[in-house]
């Protein structure tokens, strides 16, 4: 029996479809990338300036990493479209002060 990726995924989840990781601070985005890679699931990075760990940003080829500031929703949406990701997941903290500026 295959090891489940996550019990929270829908039954029709497509492992061949790309997932965009919206990466905040900390270890969670790094752990998520490692988990997706271990299952061979393609993924792209949506990094936030001064939030996403540099080592995570550098772990992606330039064609699979995108960056924006926290408040740049339009740019984030353009980046998501450019990445051609079918799914998106947020992992890691965003500095609260930056959310309300």
Name the predicted role of every residue range:
Residues 9-15, 58, 81-83:
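Solvent-exposed alpha-helices and their adjacent loops that cap or buttress functional pockets
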Residues 14, 27-31, 68-75, 83:
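Conserved active-site and cofactor/substrate-binding residues in soluble primary-metabolism enzymes
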Residues 31-32, 55, 99-101:
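Short glycine-/acidic-enriched loop or helix-start segments at secondary-structure transitions
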Residues 47-69:
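N-terminal beta-loop-helix "entrance" segment that forms/cooperates
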Residues 27, 49-53, 72-73, 95-96:
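Short active-site-proximal "capping" loops at secondary-structure junctions
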Residues 73-101:
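N-terminal glycine-rich phosphate/adenylate-binding segment common to multiple enzyme folds
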Residues 2-4, 8-48:
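N-terminal basic/disordered segments at the start of proteins
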Residues 17, 63, 86:
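Conserved acidic residues
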């Amino acid at each position: 029996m295959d090891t489940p990726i996550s019990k929270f995924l829908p039954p029709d989840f497509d492992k061949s479809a790309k997932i965009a990781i919206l990466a905040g601070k900390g270890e969670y985005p790094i752990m998520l990338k490692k988990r997706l890679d271990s299952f061979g699931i393609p993924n792209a990075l949506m990094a936030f300036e001064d939030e996403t760990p540099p080592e995570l940003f550098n772990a992606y080829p330039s064609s699979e990493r995108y960056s924006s500031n926290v408040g740049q929703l339009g740019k984030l949406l353009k980046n998501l479209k450019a990445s051609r990701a079918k799914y998106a997941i947020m992992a890691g903290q965003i500095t609260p002060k930056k959310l309300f500026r």
